[in-house]
Amino acid sequence: MAGWILRILGTMLFTMLSLLDASGTAHAVPVTGPTTGKTLPVTETAATKFSPEPAIRVGLATGQEAAVFLAKGEYVVRDGATELGLEKLSANATLTVTKRGGQFLLNGKPVSAKILVVKRADSRASIPIFYNGEAYRGDFRLIMQNGAITVINNVTLDDYVSGVIGAEMGADWPMEALRAQAVAARTFALYSLGRHEKEGFDVCPNTHCQVYGGIAAESKTVLAAVSSTRGEVMMYNDKPIYSAFHASSGGWTAGNEEAGGAPLPYLKSVRDEPTYRTEYHWQIAVSAAEIRAKLRTAGFDIGTLKRVELTPLEEGARKETADRYVSGRVRMVRFVGTLRTAEILGPKLRWLLGLPGTRFDIRYQKGTATTPNRNGKIEFHGQSSEMLLFDGWGRGHGVGMSQWGAHAMAAKKDYRAILHHYYTNVEIIKLY
């Protein structure tokens, strides 16, 4: 049995049930085919036969001295190991969890429990629990790590997805774009189960995993997008895919290897819808002195900058070179100095200089005048006013679905077509 299925089993909120009926007959599960995009009935495989919705553990905060909770109805604190009740709080009562010498304190009262669970007194109640002023669904698990408190939100997968797509996309976005984001976010969550296992949870609430905003990120349109795609995930070879997404591709998405990962058969460079928004095109000028300083902090002391080498970006050429990928993104830039030459990979340069993306060309700039990159070499002359202008398209790593591209496609395509455009040869399967 695949490892990801075992991880799902370990995070189920309810007893795991088979989709086989009492007679042992398999039900049909709707699947979108990778080429036709049509919905087809298929017999379930081991990857599709689990009906309960799994839960996911979101690590909201680590290294905390205290955590403050409040609920609009009665809620309780239990020992996470024994389920023994430790505290019962009335509606609107505040619970402050602190620590002392590796021990939890509940409103100043020490308890022996090593794991705390904060949950509604009535499990059927739909009241939110507030953590540090923000409302969340599900319940909370608190653990002590390295003498500090880690706060974990245990939530059903689709409640988690609702808190993700509302934070990743605007509530006023087209419904088909929101649905595509819901399936991508749900798939990424399943793929990422156990990503932060050493810290006691599955995923973090920021861009390292997916931005998660809890109930504050929800809206009617977001909830509708999640419910209308309930349980749907993208699969390749019977496993959830690494469904990466980004803000804007700048015309062409990137293959997974272009962002420093291993090549993946379902994450290829594809043509994207131009959006002609501020997210699409950007320019950033960096002085020669700042480039030298940034390279030196990364261990490359090139001395005074003499030349920068990069093949000019040709729109529509789709030509791979030694320093560019087929999408036009930068594989490597060569910086020639008085002391040495440094070849910096595109993703590393993006991080060093704070660039929005790696699909860019370069220009020489002095004052307000700029000179284009005609032959792949930009010469510098040791003058303090010299700048290197990065002229770029797209924001983010460029891999997988472009959110603004999905926004544009939603005017003519449904969410399945959007997903099949960005993720090659995948199946969209309803898991629960």
Write out the residue ranges for each language-model feature:
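Conserved, single-site charged/polar hotspot
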Residues: 2-432
